[in-house]
């Protein structure tokens, strides 16, 4: 079903069970096929491909040559009906690729709200991206990667499959991340190493000075004190009783399967 207010260029091709919302625009030479839903006020520019079982929310902007919902690159994939789910107000720039999930995981790839995916960024199968993130030009999110809210993965960086990037973390350009990066941490290099907290990001997002000082203390316990990881965790448990912002660091320490960069 195509809403009567949608503007579809005559050179676009739409086939299958496609739902297009109010005030959506679809540019020339775009191909939309399969079980696709596009929410109200979304702009799909020219030469975009949207396929498979894909749901896109409202007020997104999708630039030329983006490919969304295509088959993933996992050799185990056998054509199962897996999905891509994209939220609202995202900017998906030129040649971004977002692949559908696999049945070996949650069978879906998820992009939240208010994210910027820059030119040629690659979002592999089963990736979960939160809200308000920045994924830089040519950045690669390997299969099953998780990126927390307000995190940044800068240009030409690669995140190894199954790694987690914590909320408000910042991965500098040209980095290779092979283990989890705790929330708030600034990391860079090949292999990526921690270089302090993402202080600029914390200040921009309204963290108060007492919170930032507590997070700096938590960082020092983990990375500068010479303590074992278990000893540092015990110190963070006490700190979290006063500062709730320390809790996400503890949660990732407990849930990490690949270990953290340290």
From Swiss-Prot:
It is an enzyme of class 2 (transferase). GO terms for cellular component: cytoplasm; membrane. Pfam families: Acetyltransf_11, Hexapep. Pathway: Glycolipid biosynthesis; lipid IV(A) biosynthesis; lipid IV(A) from (3R)-3-hydroxytetradecanoyl-[acyl-carrier-protein] and UDP-N-acetyl-alpha-D-glucosamine: step 1/6. It catalyses: a (3R)-hydroxyacyl-[ACP] + UDP-N-acetyl-alpha-D-glucosamine = a UDP-3-O-[(3R)-3-hydroxyacyl]-N-acetyl-alpha-D-glucosamine + holo-[ACP]. One of its GO terms (molecular function) is acyl-[acyl-carrier-protein]-UDP-N-acetylglucosamine O-acyltransferase activity. Its EC number is 2.3.1.129. Homotrimer. NCBIfam families: lipid_A_lpxA, PRK05289.1. Involved in the biosynthesis of lipid A, a phosphorylated glycolipid that anchors the lipopolysaccharide to the outer membrane of the cell. Belongs to the transferase hexapeptide repeat family. LpxA subfamily. HAMAP family: LpxA (MF_00387). This is Acyl-[acyl-carrier-protein]--UDP-N-acetylglucosamine O-acyltransferase.
């Amino acid at each position: 079903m195509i809403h009567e207010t949608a503007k579809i260029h005559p050179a676009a091709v739409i086939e299958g069970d496609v739902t297009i919302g109010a005030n959506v625009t679809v540019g020339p030479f775009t191909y939309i096929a399969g079980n696709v839903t596009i929410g109200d006020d979304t702009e799909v520019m020219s030469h975009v491909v949207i396929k498979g079982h894909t749901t896109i929310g409202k007020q997104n902007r999708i630039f030329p040559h983006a490919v969304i919902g295509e088959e993933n690159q996992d050799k185990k994939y056998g054509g199962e009906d897996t999905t891509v789910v994209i939220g609202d107000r995202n900017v998906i720039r030129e040649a971004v690729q977002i692949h559908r999930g696999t049945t070996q995981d949650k069978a879906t790839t998820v992009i939240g709200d208010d994210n910027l995916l820059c030119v040629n960024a690659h979002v592999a199968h089963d990736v979960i991206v939160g809200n308000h993130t920045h994924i830089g030009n040519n950045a690669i999110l390997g299969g099953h990667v998780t990126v927390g809210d307000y995190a940044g993965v800068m240009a030409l960086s690669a995140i190894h499959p199954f790694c987690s990037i914590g909320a408000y973390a910042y991965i500098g350009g040209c980095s290779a991340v092979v283990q989890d990066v705790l929330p708030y941490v600034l990391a860079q290099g090949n292999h990526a190493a921690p270089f302090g907290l993402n202080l600029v990001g914390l200040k921009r997002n309204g963290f108060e000075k007492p919170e930032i000082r507590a997070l700096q203390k938590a960082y020092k316990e983990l990375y500068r004190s010479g303590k074992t990881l278990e000893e540092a965790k015990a110190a963070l448990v006490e700190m979290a009783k006063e500062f709730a912002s320390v809790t996400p660091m503890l949660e990732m320490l407990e849930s990490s399967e690949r270990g953290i960069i340290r």
